[in-house]
Amino acid sequence: MENKFMGRSLTVIDDLSIDERKYLFDKTKRLKKAIQEDDQKVMDEFRINDKDFGIYEVFLEPSTRTKESFRNAAKFHQVKLSDLAAESSSFNKGESYADTFNTLAGYQNSIFIVRSKVEGVCRWLEDEAQAFYQRNNLKRKPAFINAGDGKHEHPTQELLDEFTFIEDNNWSFDKIHIALVGDLYHGRTVHSKADGLKIFKSVKVDLIAPAELAMPEYYKVRMQENGFTVREFSSIEEYLRQADVALIWYFTRPQLERMGEQVLKKQDELRRSITFRKEFIEKLPENTRFYHPLPRHRVHPTIPTFLDATPLNGWERQSINGMYVRMVLLSMIAGKIGDDYKGPEPKSCERVEDEDYIVEVPINNSKESKVETFSEGVRPIQNGIVIDHICRGDKPSVIRHHMSKIINVMGLEEGKGGEWVSTSTKDKGTFKGIIFRPGEYKFSRADLKRLSAVASSCTLNLIKDGKIQSKYRTHLPPRIYNFEDLICKNEACISHPAQSEGVPAIFYRTIDNRYACQYCGTIHTFKEIWGEKKN
């Protein structure tokens, strides 16, 4: 039977389906019990037990718990464990991520555990390593585990969090009401919950953070897409003034050092808003538990140490569970366990593309084909193109700015013609943009895709001998890729030019008709994903 987990990467929490995570948690429950009871027979069911099986820790950012948790998990498996010394590695000589990891994969290393400030790096390495594996006929396809990438995600922390929540919920997946408290902007552990909490049938999330530390919009949108009920509060004090208080509280450390001087001036006020105080205890419902990915700040802990010996303490067992979860994850990816998984096939991470986002409009030769004036001041042309209805409904300044972007992206800088901002013939108060170019123009399917990506909801008219030869209406494509001038606006993203990795930007459409970067998840409008066209 084919093992569905062997060689799989975990770059974001959604790389494992809900059924696959339930399988992992069931196995973790079994292994944890075996270790506590020193049941060697059950432990051996999980052990990789192969001295030639290479697991490599590559931590390019400081870590204690995650690194040591993985190290101890790997030692349990009795494998070849290596650790890249980042300070003396070829990264400091300007070597790319792809070259470094391909080299290490060539030395018969099978699983890479990676922590980096660069967001989306594991997703890129997964794609790159697949090609390297095939070119060089390696014994195993390298797998990558994201141990935290910038402020993006921390999927193994999400796994151990979920396991602990479920363990404390009598192994029920029915519902969860959770309060996320602290630095929700930088805290990648809370970002993973936007998809991770889908494992519960009913999810209610209370976001508790001042505006400066609030959850990024992308993750709030993801929660809403996933059917979560989401509420927002600016402080613990405000949250406890209302009656519907969660039993599960998840705190994160404020990372104020990553923010500017204006925020640092308010640090005492910001910390106070997300730090639990003694007077709050009497306002908590019975059976409330607190969790924290750790570490706690020794001077300014959001969960003060006076709570350590109280029933609120769920964070210590949560930390211990991390090693058990990671033991099982390594066992699954190595193919030691997983043959007995009977869940459905995982859905492809590729987005659906077989939809009509370029629609050819039928031309009525007796009437519609005659070129009429598109707008006041724009005379009909005999041959050429007219792109109409650009940014309909926007302000004239916005329309003009985006028309210049369309001209650059579509390569329409040369030749005669012009641009015009006008009002709609049907709605005089609604502005739209028009680009017209007389001359001989041909539009390939690739050109139409490009136009759809940069000028959604416009109309393209191809004109010959004074008649409309063909007409197309554009809509937002489900994915945008294979264009050199695409750019993710997040400088920490592996695909951003600032990283000098040569990774092509790829975007997929969200449910609210915007675009998310495939690597880091940053949300863009279709107007924001284009850089300057490369010559």
UniProtKB/Swiss-Prot annotation:
The keyword Metal-binding applies. Pfam families: OTCace, OTCace_N, PyrI, PyrI_C. Residues 1-341 are annotated as: Aspartate carbamoyltransferase. It catalyses: carbamoyl phosphate + L-aspartate = N-carbamoyl-L-aspartate + phosphate + H(+). GO terms for biological process: 'de novo' pyrimidine nucleobase biosynthetic process; 'de novo' UMP biosynthetic process; amino acid metabolic process. GO terms for molecular function: amino acid binding; aspartate carbamoyltransferase activity; metal ion binding. It comes from the Bacteria. GO terms for cellular component: aspartate carbamoyltransferase complex. Residues 371-535 are annotated as: Aspartate carbamoyltransferase regulatory region. Residues 342-370 are annotated as: Linker. NCBIfam families: asp_carb_tr (TIGR00670), PRK13376.1 (NF009916). This is Protein PyrBI. It comes from Treponema denticola (strain ATCC 35405 / DSM 14222 / CIP 103919 / JCM 8153 / KCTC 15104).
